[in-house]
């Protein structure tokens, strides 16, 4: 008291003298040190010299300075007695300099100093001589240095010290002797050091210590009496160490309120582990390889508010919490719990939050005794049934998460007594129906992943709903999402952004609950709900998930029906003429006939879609989910892919066959084998079947859209599959183009007209050109989707899917019917019973097979091809009527005349 009065008196006298001196004529007030900033604080001065590039102490510091900040400079040393005249200095900051040593007397004369900051320097030991006799010092920061040694006399005379920072240094042991003199110390941190062991009575004289941080060390063992003497300790942090055993030494800490020892190697929590800590409020010990927890470990902790046991993978039995009646938040995730005791709520009447996610719980007890529950998290368990009594009378429950279970049965009145429930997550279960009773207050509803839940959910039961996730987009139609899209078109970008942000925030809510207070979560939740005034439903309806009509526009509808009718009629004519009875079918006509059959299958798949559109006209949303997930859609998708791929492959074989045939004919070589063509056809069919089956074998389905075809955008697996098909088909078209280009270039100029004009060669060229042109939009859209180019609207994609892809199914036979003269001959033969190919084998040109004759026939002119004397081998097909057709002879010909085939 005498010292304080003397200092105050001296301050008053000196201040008066300063005022008098400053009032003299010609005298000015003493200025602030040159690089610093000063601020008057009553009779005293606050001097800020931080981050000024100083290499030493500034001169002319006022003796009335109470606060001096010299941090973030380049000061390397402090001279002795440099600050001895600053008797009123209470806070000195020297952080962030290059001090390696502080000599004795550096702080001499600082009898009023209360706060000394020396962090972020280069000190290798505590400057014990410089710190002695700072009797008023209350806070000392020595963190973030290189201190590896604390002399025993370091803190002698620091009788008023309350806070000590020694973290982020290189200490390897507790400075036991140095701490003996700090009986008034209240908070100390020794974190981020290299301490291995805490000996007995390490803090024996720190009876006033309230907070002790020892986290991020290398502590692997504790003395059984290492915490003896810490009678006032309330917070103990042992996180991020190498402890192998539960710290049994905490039993002496009767006033302990907060305990953390997570992220260690503790494998067991013994029985009655906290028997000596009746004041414990919060404990964290997640991220330990805990294999065993004593049932009585958490008994009789009447003040415990929070219990977190994350990652205790070997816990198989729910802990006995008798006497722990104040528990408000219980987290026990990633364990092996199979059941919950029926008395869990009797033991925990004040429970507000319970998180038992990532366990193996199969049966739930009644939570009706937990009247204060606000949040229940049971996701990723094995719950099968929700009974009537499971959540009865939980009037305060606001969030219920039951996602990723096996729930197949929910009692119709399970949620009838939950008036405060605003968030319900039942995604990824096995639901076939959803009870709506009592859910009128919901704002968030998640039912995605329940593929068997196909019924529409009435919107009138959810007047406050703002965000919802459904198994199918059609279920969003009931909430006017489709109508809003129709009337408003594309929503405003700002509205979309706010909705997306809200949705993303909603997705992350449950993940934030471990780190945020639940009350704050609810406040933020309610504020976000007020921002959005319309229902945000996903997956959203659109052209590929229509609400009313499968095809949408009448133009598309008429176009599809026209394609279907033409494909049936025209392909039937081609098939009838090619495969007419008792006629010989050469390889090229066999390929054309098979393409017609495949085109009929493509028309059939489009016809199925057209029929579904007609049957569900104006009300497709009611049947959309049923159609997508049904067998009919799978078969339709299989036929579409199979027909599309087989058609391309057979066309490729036809192009190659024409090239080889013409080459053999013009060079008088042996003609290509019919057997090789048949083998190629079989290979095409097998490859198409493999491609069409691959989506089903890979776990995917054709039911990603109601059109039962892999989409050009959206689902990644479908898009990858579609791009792979486009690449394969593009390769086929490239091969065909190269083959025909090579054929054109290889023919001599004189022979070009005679050979190139042949009907079948021209027909395959026409098919190649037409199919290639029609496939360009499909390829372009596929690569656009792969590159995330969104300038093409979904309506255009839909038109391509429904019209362009099946269009070859009707164009291919039309081209044959309209432009190939063989069709006229074949249809005439079909009428009159004549067989053109049979007749050609009985003409005067019996030395040439009908297939070779067809190759050389021309559609409009009579061709005369003169061959040089050569040897030609002919293989005629066998017939049952005459063995004379089975022959292989060599003929010497000088010239062969061909009659026109018209």
UniProtKB/Swiss-Prot annotation:
* Residue intervals on the Cytoplasmic side: 579-589, 656-678, 740-763, 820-902
Expressed, tissue-wise, as follows: Expressed in the developing epithelial stem cells of the intestine.
Q: Give this protein's Gene Ontology molecular function annotations.
A: protein-hormone receptor activity; transmembrane signaling receptor activity
Return the LRR repeat spans: 41-61, 62-85, 86-109, 111-133, 134-157, 159-181, 182-205, 207-229, 230-253, 254-276, 278-300, 301-324, 325-347, 348-372, 374-393, 394-417, 418-441, 598-619
Q: Which family does the UniProt entry place this protein in? A: Belongs to the G-protein coupled receptor 1 family.
Arranged from A to Z, the UniProt key words for this protein are: Cell membrane, Disulfide bond, G-protein coupled receptor, Glycoprotein, Golgi apparatus, Leucine-rich repeat, Membrane, Receptor, Repeat, Signal, Transducer, Transmembrane, Transmembrane helix
Disulfide bonds, which pairs?
32-38, 36-49, 345-370, 476-537, 633-708
What SUPFAM superfamilies does UniProt report for this protein, alphabetically? Family A G protein-coupled receptor-like (SSF81321), RNI-like (SSF52047)
Output the PANTHER family linked to this UniProt entry: GLYCOPROTEIN HORMONE RECEPTOR
Query: S-adenosyl-L-methionine as a keyword?
Result: no
Choose any GO biological process term that the UniProt entry carries and state it: adenylate cyclase-activating G protein-coupled receptor signaling pathway
List glycan-bearing residues: 60, 74, 205, 496, 788, 797
Q: Function of this protein?
A: Receptor for R-spondins that potentiates the canonical Wnt signaling pathway and acts as a stem cell marker of the intestinal epithelium and the hair follicle. Upon binding to R-spondins (RSPO1, RSPO2, RSPO3 or RSPO4), associates with phosphorylated LRP6 and frizzled receptors that are activated by extracellular Wnt receptors, triggering the canonical Wnt signaling pathway to increase expression of target genes. In contrast to classical G-protein coupled receptors, does not activate heterotrimeric G-proteins to transduce the signal.
| Extracellular-facing ranges | 23-557, 611-634, 700-718, 785-798
Residues folding into a coiled coil are none
The record places domain LRRNT at 32-61
- Name the gene behind this protein: lgr5-a
Species: Xenopus laevis
Organism lineage: Eukaryota, Metazoa, Chordata, Craniata, Vertebrata
* Name under which the protein is recorded: Leucine-rich repeat-containing G-protein coupled receptor 5A
Q: Which GO terms describe its cellular component?
A: plasma membrane; trans-Golgi network membrane
Q: Mind telling me which Pfam families this protein's record contains?
A: 7tm_1, LRR_8, LRRNT
Kindly indicate where the leader peptide sits in this chain.
1-22
Segments passing through the bilayer:
558-578, 590-610, 635-655, 679-699, 719-739, 764-784, 799-819
Q: Topology versus the membrane, per the UniProt entry?
A: Multi-pass membrane protein
What does the UniProt entry say about where the protein is found?
A: Cell membrane; Golgi apparatus, trans-Golgi network membrane
